[in-house]
Amino acid sequence: MSACRTRRTRTVRRAGFTLALAAGIAALSFAAAQSAAVTVVETGSTLIYPLFNSWIAAYAKVDPGLRMTAGATGSEAGISQAIAKQVQIGTSDAYMSDNQAMANPQILNIPLAISAQTVEANLPELRGTPLKLSGPVLAGIYSGKVRDWDAAPIAALNGGVRLPHHTIVPVRRAEGSGDTFIFTQFLTFSTPDLHLQATANILYDWESRIGYGTTVSWPSVPGSLTASGNDGMLQTIARTPYAVGYLGISFKADADKAGLEAAMLENQDGKFLLPTAATITAAAAALTPRTPPDERLTLAFAPGPDSYPLINYEYAVVSTRQPNPQVASAISNFLLWCISPQGGSAASLLDRVHFIALPTAIRALSEIQIAKIQ
C-alpha cells in the first residue's frame, strides 16, 4: 500500500457506521477442533510478530495437528502476500486501502488485538527524564524544519529541561510498514491546516504535503537514517546518539534495556501521556464504537484527556476463499482462539507485549468476519 493519503480519510473510516452485531454466533469450538496435518503460513507485521510466535507455541497444545510458521516481513508485505495467496494469513498494523478493498472483496481485515507505538529517543544527557513531544513537532523533525534538540518548538514543550544542543537524527522504516502507517496518521491528524497558522515557518503541514500510508514520500532530511523492521529500528536508535524514531510497543522492554527513553506524546486534549494499559484502553474506548462491519478503522489521535495518541488494531488479512475446508477450518479455529479471552487474548499472553484485548463488541465483529472463511 504505497499510495499515501492527504485527505482526512479518518472521517470516512470513523463516521457514519454503527456496529452491526449478528445474533447467534456459535460458541467457540477451537478447543474441540483439531487439524489433520494442516500447514498455515503467516507473514507481515513485525509489531505483532513476538505475540504471534507466542500464539503458535500456545496453540500447539490446543491443536497439535496444525503446522504454522510466522514471518516478520512488514505489514505491506503481509497485505500484498495475502492478496496474492502466497500466505494463508497476512498480519498488518494497517488496514487495506479503499482501492485495495474494492479490488479484493474476498480479503478480510480482521482485528485480533489492540496495540500501540512508542516514540523513542537516544539522549544521553536526559536518561530518566521524560521528554515531551507533539505531532506538529515530530512533523517538524521528520521534515527537517526542526533540526536541533534544543530548538524552540521542543524547548516550549519541555520547560525547565536542559536540552542538548545536538542535531536530531530521525530514523524511519526502510520498507512498507504498518508502523509507518500509524506514525504518519498521527502526524497527519495532529497537523491539520498548519499552512494557515503563524507556526507554518517553523513546523510542517504534514497533512497536505505528505499524508499517511505504509510507504510515504518522506521529506529529505540530511543525516536521517532508515532501518528494516522494529528490531532494526531499535538497534539503529540505540547505537545512534541523538536519534529519535517510532517503535512497536511489543519492543518496549528491549528499548528500556537499551537505555532509550519513550517520549510523552501530546494527545488531542493537550495532555502528554506514555502508553500504558490505561491510556491505550482509554483511546480504544473513544473510537472502537465507530468500527464499521469491515473493521477498517483509524485509532490514532483519539479524543479524550486520557487517550494515548498512537494506537491501532492488529489485523489478520485473510481470504474468504481457502483451498479446502480443512485449511479454512484450521484458520478459523486459530483466529477464534486468538481473540478469545480464554485463548490468545488472555492477559498472560497480551501483557508480555503491552497489547490489550478487543472490546466485546469488536470481538463479535471479528467473529462475524471469521465465519466468512471457507
Segments and roles (model prediction):
Residues 13-16, 299:
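Hydrophobic alpha-helical segments with strong N-terminal bias
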